Amino acid sequence: MKEEYKLSHLKELEAESIHIIREVAAEFENPVMLYSIGKDSSVMVRLAEKAFYPGKVPFPLMHIDSKWKFKEMIQFRDEYAKKYGWNLIVESNMEAFHAGVGPFTHGSKVHTDLMKTQALLRALDKYKFDAAFGGARRDEEKSRAKERIFSFRDKFHQWDPKNQRPELWDIYNARVHKGESIRVFPLSNWTELDIWQYIRLENIPIVPLYYAKERPVVQMDGNLIMADDERLPEKYRDQIEMKMVRFRTLGCWPLTGAVESEADTIEKIVEEMMTTTKSERTTRVIDFDQEGSMEQKKREGYF
């Protein structure tokens, strides 16, 4: 093959993801793209924009707001939704929020179920979405590693890992009965390093929390938790110290550990990723609140 016809590794991944996104737009009546404000979501949104350029993305973005996201995440979401004219839906479980549900009072498992999973399932039912894009990658965590790109959900939005559809080459089965749906993961074959290299290549805006900076953190169960607002319990406040840290993954601030790092530019992050031996999910408290935690959450309808 002539050199000019060869695609780079990133361009191959890009082409595969764009094909998946277009396939969903063609096959489903009412798809939605779940937007978590993180680096993977930012890449997925850019791919969707490319897939339909110069037209507009033909489906909305939806953010499930747990009310415990980092302040910088919400600021970034609102700023860029306005700047790029996104059709953005924001949904929350306000009943649980007003009842005082939170990670410090109820623990990570109950908080995640009520403020994330149940909020998501209600929103999917409310808008009658039949397909939902997610930014999960197979290299993140073992239960995600075995999940199909087109991941079938029954009428209760539940996933059965022992009853998955075969996926041969780039042929995807989009058939569902009324009430059933598909979760679609166009970034399945990307790695964390691929994501960062693509962000650098495309100059994609990301939340500043990904860059190393002096931040107020406290040690909680082996994790460096950033003191993001006044809801930090009193007992931890005198333990706050300033450290040079960044976040490899973003979620609810009491459940997301920072890592000590000097990587304050994209180039330094890419260099750091080339030598790291741990998944970014090792800093997410929700992945370890019970045995087989992520798989159980996904069975129940989690992202």
Curated annotation (Swiss-Prot):
Pfam families: PAPS_reduct. Keywords: ATP-binding, Nucleotide-binding, Nucleotidyltransferase, Transferase. It is an enzyme of class 2 (transferase). Its EC number is 2.7.7.4. GO terms for biological process: hydrogen sulfide biosynthetic process; sulfate assimilation. InterPro entries: PAPS_reduct_dom (IPR002500), Rossmann-like_a/b/a_fold (IPR014729), SO4_adenylTrfase_ssu (IPR011784), Sulfate_adenylyltrnsfr_sub2 (IPR050128). With CysN forms the ATP sulfurylase (ATPS) that catalyzes the adenylation of sulfate producing adenosine 5'-phosphosulfate (APS) and diphosphate, the first enzymatic step in sulfur assimilation pathway. APS synthesis involves the formation of a high-energy phosphoric-sulfuric acid anhydride bond driven by GTP hydrolysis by CysN coupled to ATP hydrolysis by CysD. Belongs to the PAPS reductase family. CysD subfamily. Heterodimer composed of CysD, the smaller subunit, and CysN. This is Sulfate adenylyltransferase subunit 2. The lineage of its organism: Bacteria, Pseudomonadati, Bacteroidota, Bacteroidia, Bacteroidales.
